Amino acid sequence: MSEAKKLLAQGLWKNNSALVQLLGLCPLLAVSSTATNALGLGLATTLVLVCTNTAVSALRRWVPSEIRIPIYVMIIASVVSTVQMLINAYAFGLYQSLGIFIPLIVTNCIVIGRAEAYAAKNPVGLSALDGFAMGMGATCALFVLGALREILGNGTLFDGADMLLGSWATVLRIDILHLDTPFLLAMLPPGAFIGLGLLLAGKYVIDEKMKARKANTRVSVPQLQDGDAEKAL
């Protein structure tokens, strides 16, 4: 398997930052009340990861090891500020909905962790791909949790998609369950913890089934001993 495929497999599934490393749980639980909010924050985090990894990798030969962490934080803060201004300019509704959790990307352990563990030691191209894979892995986890909570809580999917994609995206709203009153447990923090637990359990079950399938498909071919080979002849 090539290095690029390994990075994608690690980021999207095997070493998923949200479901395996359990990093960035604060925004994961707080913002995932709807699929739109979850997708918006996930894409913003992915953009920050790609830009940060690219910058850290490009500057890795000139950054003194003694002060590398403060420099990484400054790079991350600069990128996050730029992303925050872009969201404020082009998706103001989403900006208001996400609130403080956009600037809090600066403190997200996923971002500083990938900068230190991978980008500071590898070429620019692979570092950017690592940031993309890790970001999309977190985005997928955020989106699934947000969609699950929105469906169970409000009976809808992609409600408020126009905040992220523009006025045309109102047609994306889907009414799945017709609820007389919202199911508050799914929308409140306890529902976020329960939903995350279900996702973790689901990933564990899938991983175990994949392991069992691989074990069953292994075919061991017994080698004939010399004596058996002579008898066969």
Swiss-Prot record:
Record has Transmembrane helix as a keyword: yes
Primary location recorded for the protein, binned into one broad class: membrane
Residues in the signal sequence: none
GO biological process: electron transport chain
Localisation: Cell inner membrane
Bilayer-crossing regions: 18-38, 39-59, 69-89, 92-112, 128-148, 182-202
InterPro entries: NqrDE/RnfAE (IPR003667), RnfE (IPR010968)
EC number: 7.-.-.-
Keyword terms, alphabetized: Cell inner membrane, Cell membrane, Electron transport, Membrane, Translocase, Transmembrane, Transmembrane helix, Transport
Record membrane topology: Multi-pass membrane protein
GO cellular component: plasma membrane
Keyword Electron transport set for record: yes
Subunit annotation: The complex is composed of six subunits: RnfA, RnfB, RnfC, RnfD, RnfE and RnfG.
Functional note: Part of a membrane-bound complex that couples electron transfer with translocation of ions across the membrane.
Family: Belongs to the NqrDE/RnfAE family.
Designated name of the protein: Ion-translocating oxidoreductase complex subunit E
